[in-house]
Amino acid sequence: MALTKYVLGELLDRNTEYNDQLKFGTENVRGVLNTKGISDTRVSVDTRDLSKFLVVRPGGFIFNHRVHDKLGLGYNTSNDVYIFTNDYVAFYVKPEMAKNVLLPDYLYIWYLRPEFDRYMLFKTYGSATLFFNWDNMCELEIELPDITIQRKFVAIYKAMVANQQSYERGLEDLKLVCDGYIEDLRRKMQCAPIGDFIGQSKEKNSDGLITLEQGINIEKKFITPQRSNDNFYGRQIVRTGQIAYCTQLNNANIAVALRTGPDCIVSSVYDVIFIKDQTKLLPEYLMIWLSRREFGRFVYWASQGTSYEFLSYENLAGYKIPVPDIHVQEAIASIYNCYIRRREINEQLKAQIKDICPILIKGSLEESAKA
C-alpha cells in the first residue's frame, strides 16, 4: 500500500471565525505552549476587545506565528470552544480530507515530533523575531499512509494518553486530600510566625570543597544553573534538609526549594534557612506552605524595592502558618511527598508519550510501505 505525498495546503482550511457576536467570554480565552498544548492564558485580557478573538472549536488547530526554537501550537481535543487573540493562526483539516485522507489526530502526532520543529525553523523568516505564517504551513510536505493505518496508530497514541490522564486524575485527588488537611488546620489552629522556628544560615564554601553548583526555579526545584562560575570559594552552602530561596522577585512566583540531595552551593542572590528544632517543625511540612500560591502573594506584598523587589529574611520570618503536633506534620508531609513522587511519574509518562510520537509516525509509514 503506497504512501501518498501531499502539501498541507491541499488538506487544510484556514479558520477565520471570530467572536464578533461575543458569544464567548474571558473564561474561554486560551493560549498555546511550545510543547504543543493549549493552556490558560497568562496575561490579563480584561481590557481586550473579545470580538476580535479567533474561535477554535473542537478538532481545530491553532498556532502562534511568532517563533522561538519551537512552534507554539495547540489542538483542541476537548468538547469546549476556546478563543484566542488574533496574533494566532487557526485552521482545520478539511472535512472531506478528514474522512478518507488525513485524521486530525494523526496530524497532531505528526506535529509533536521534534523533526517538525527543526523543519519549521528552516522555513521561518525574520531577524530579531522569527515568523512562521500560514503560507509557510501550507507549503510543508507530508507523506500519508492509508487512513486505516492512521487509525491504528492513532488508537495506540490515544490509549497511552488515556492511561496518563487517568493517572493524573488520581494525582489531583491526592492533592485535594493534602490541601483539605492544610485548610482544616488553618481554620482550627492559631498561626505562628515561622521566624519562631527557623534560623538564617550564612555558611560559606570557604575551603572550596563543595563543587556542586545549583539554582532554583519557580517550580520549587533545584536545577543546574544556566550560567556557571568556576570560582566555588565563598559561595553560600545549602545543606541537605535546608531551604533556599531567591531574594530577588519578578512576581509572586518565588523560587524556593527544600534541599533533599547532597550539599550544594548557590549564588549570592539566594538566602538559606534551617529549622532550629525538627521535633517542633518539619522542613517538609514548612515546604508545603512555602509552595502554596498564598505564600507567593505574601512575599510579593512583603518585598521591598523599586526597580527590583527583594525579600529580606526578616520579612520572610513574619509569614504565619499553623504548627500542629509533629505526628500530624509527618502524616501531612507523607501524603504530600507521595503526591510529589506521583507528579514526577506523571511528567515522565507525558515525556514518554511525546517521545513515542516519532516512532508512531515512522511505524505507520513502514507498515504502509510493506502492505
Which residue stretches match the model-derived regions?
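Non-catalytic DNA-recognition/assembly elements of restriction-modification systems
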Residues: M1-N19, E139-S206, I216-N217, P322-A371
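Alpha-helix initiation and N-capping motif
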Residues: K5, P104, C191, V266, ...
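Sequence-specific dsDNA recognition surfaces
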Residues: K5-F61, D196-I243
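Non-catalytic, surface-exposed connector residues within folded enzymatic/regulatory domains
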Residues: K23, N100-V101, F131, K280, ...
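A short beta-sheet element
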Residues: P58, F63-L112, A244-S291
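A short glycine-rich beta-alpha junction/loop motif
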Residues: Y82-V89, Y125-T148, C264-D271, Q304-E330
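Short, solvent-exposed alpha-helical surface patches in well-structured domains
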Residues: Y106, Y119, E139, I149-K152, ...
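Internal, well-ordered alpha/beta segment that forms a basic, Gly-enriched binding/recognition surface
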Residues: F116
